[in-house]
Amino acid sequence: MARPMLLLXLSLGLLASLLPALAACPQNCHCHSDLQHVICDKVGLQKIPKVSEKTKLLNLQRNNFPVLATNSFRAMPNLVSLHLQHCQIREVAAGAFRGLKQLIYLYLSHNDIRVLRAGAFDDLTELTYLYLDHNKVTELPRGLLSPLVNLFILQLNNNKIRELRSGAFQGAKDLRWLYLSENSLSSLQPGALDDVENLAKFYLDRNQLSSYPSAALSKLRVVEELKLSHNPLKSIPDNAFQSFGRYLETLWLDNTNLEKFSDGAFLGVTTLKHVHLENNRLHQLPSNFPFDSLETLTLTNNPWKCTCQLRGLRRWLEAKTSRPDATCASPAKFRGQHIRDTDAFRGCKFPTKRSKKAGRH
């Protein structure tokens, strides 16, 4: 009798030891790598499931969590990557991610988030990648990003942000890539970017900016790519890019109804390689346009005036093996002729070519 009882006790003990592990993988979910990866993609969840403390990746895409309450993830201290795309989230409470001090990736794309209040990202001191694109966010309150001292990439494209105010990025001093495409921005207040002077990539395309935000952008120091396409800009002022001119390599100004550059627009710009100017209303380029460093330039669908003022462009085109399809709109007798081939520049005095240093970085 003693032996069967001993076997029963051992069996019950073994079963009891297995129960926590079995219970750690939520129903209908898939768990991998010894419960470190938990996949609950589109399984009908309406509340955040309980998972093992050792979980590092939690994928909760395509479920239904209208509100992320305070401490929703408190029992997941080792989480590194959290996926909450397409979860119909409307509200993120203050302290919703409290306890996630190891989190590096946070995906909140394609939800219905309208308001983000200060405190929403408390404790996320290691967060490096934050995806908030395709929501309905209207503003960034001061202090919202303060805990995010290691943030590198912030995607806020496809929201409804109307204005960037001073202090909007307070605390996010290491931010390098900022995407604000397809919002409703009509202005950037002076001081709006004071806390993110190390931005390298800045996308502002498809907004409502009617004037170049000189005061705000003048605080940036190392921008390598600036995208302003599809904004109703008419002119670019003097010194527009000077504060980061030694770093700027790619500039997008296509589809803006742009009519002119001020003579000093490109002062201080020395490394520009790629410029997009197609589908505008440009007649001329400024005399200090940085052709020397330029590798690619898109020009089509502009009413170019083929006079001697455009001779720098003609010389640059002559040196290219590709043939950008840009044509003269005036004078009338040269209309429709390719800038590279037209006789419109016959008689113009071309400056002596400066030798370039061999090699590229």
Swiss-Prot record:
UniProt-listed SMART domains: LRR_TYP, LRRCT, LRRNT
Tissue spec. comment: Cartilage.
Pfam assignment, any one: LRR_8
Coiled coil start-end: none
Record-annotated disulphide pairs: 25-40, 306-348, 308-328
Cell compartments where the protein resides: Secreted, Extracellular space, Extracellular matrix
Signal peptide: 1-24
Statement: the UniProt record of this protein carries the keyword Repeat: yes
Domain LRRNT: 25-54
Domain LRRCT: 302-350
SUPFAM superfamilies recorded: L domain-like (SSF52058)
Glycan attachment positions: 146
A single cellular component GO annotation: extracellular region
LRR repeats: 78-99, 102-123, 126-147, 150-171, 174-195, 198-219, 222-243, 247-268, 271-292
InterPro entries (alphabetical): Cys-rich_flank_reg_C, Leu-rich_rpt, Leu-rich_rpt_typical-subtyp, LRR_dom_sf, LRRNT, SLRP
Protein purpose: Promotes attachment of chondrocytes, fibroblasts, and osteoblasts. This binding is mediated (at least for chondrocytes and fibroblasts) by the integrin alpha(2)beta(1). May play an important role in the regulation of chondrocyte growth and proliferation.
Oligomer status and interactors: Mostly monomeric. Interacts with collagen type II.
PANTHER family: AGAP008170-PA, INSULIN-LIKE GROWTH FACTOR-BINDING PROTEIN COMPLEX ACID LABILE SUBUNIT
Family: Belongs to the small leucine-rich proteoglycan (SLRP) family. SLRP class IV subfamily.
Name this protein carries in UniProt: Chondroadherin
